[in-house]
């Protein structure tokens, strides 16, 4: 039963993890907007989510946990996703080699924040739906 519950929530969980990781990358781009030579980076969300979901199906990302007591419940933990960072090609490169376009970064940052909130709402809706089913006894 827990396997089915985990599978039902896994997609949203992985999407949230990748969105949070992308938010950090975009924040780093914004923070380094005035750093000479800084290369703007980003994550291809769709392809990275596919990779993470496939890796989970292959069960190659499972890490064994050590039980310190025989009364503990055996479990497995997934390794956190580490997305491949890609460099952005600038529309107008600056003279100092910095490729951060603040308008693009702000737009991407706001869009990613909105997508994160939508994923969180979808996950919350899934959990509420499951709770309703459990409480109704069906």
Swiss-Prot record:
Keywords assigned: Bacterial flagellum
Kindly report the protein's main subcellular placement as a broad class: other
Record GO cellular component, one term = bacterial-type flagellum basal body, rod
Q: Which GO terms describe its biological process?
A: bacterial-type flagellum-dependent cell motility; chemotaxis
| Domain of life where this protein originates | Bacteria
Reported consequences of knocking out the gene = Strongly repressed swarming and swimming.
Quaternary structure, from the entry: The basal body constitutes a major portion of the flagellar organelle and consists of a number of rings mounted on a central rod. In Gram-negative bacteria, at least four rings, L, P, S and M are present, whereas Gram-positive bacteria lack the L and P rings. The rod consists of about 26 subunits of FlgG in the distal portion, and FlgB, FlgC and FlgF build up the proximal portion of the rod with about 6 subunits each.
Family listed: Belongs to the flagella basal body rod proteins family.
PANTHER family in alphabetical order: FLAGELLAR BASAL BODY ROD PROTEIN FLGB, FLAGELLAR PROTEIN
Put simply, this protein is called: Flagellar basal body rod protein FlgB
Provenance organism: Escherichia coli (strain K12)
Gene encoding this chain? flgB
């Amino acid at each position: 039963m827990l396997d089915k519950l985990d599978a039902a929530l896994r997609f949203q969980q992985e999407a949230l993890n990748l969105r949070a990781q992308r938010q950090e990358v975009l924040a780093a781009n914004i923070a380094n907007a005035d750093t000479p030579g800084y290369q703007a980076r980003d994550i291809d969300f769709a392809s990275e989510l596919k990779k993470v979901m496939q890796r989970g199906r292959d069960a190659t990302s499972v890490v064994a946990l050590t039980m310190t007591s025989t009364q503990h419940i055996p479990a497995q933990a997934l390794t956190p996703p580490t997305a491949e960072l890609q460099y952005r090609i600038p529309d107008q490169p600056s003279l100092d080699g910095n490729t951060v376009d603040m308008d693009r970064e702000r737009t991407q940052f706001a869009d990613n924040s909105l997508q994160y909130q939508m994923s969180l709402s979808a996950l919350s809706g899934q959990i509420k739906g499951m709770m309703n089913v459990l409480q109704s006894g069906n």
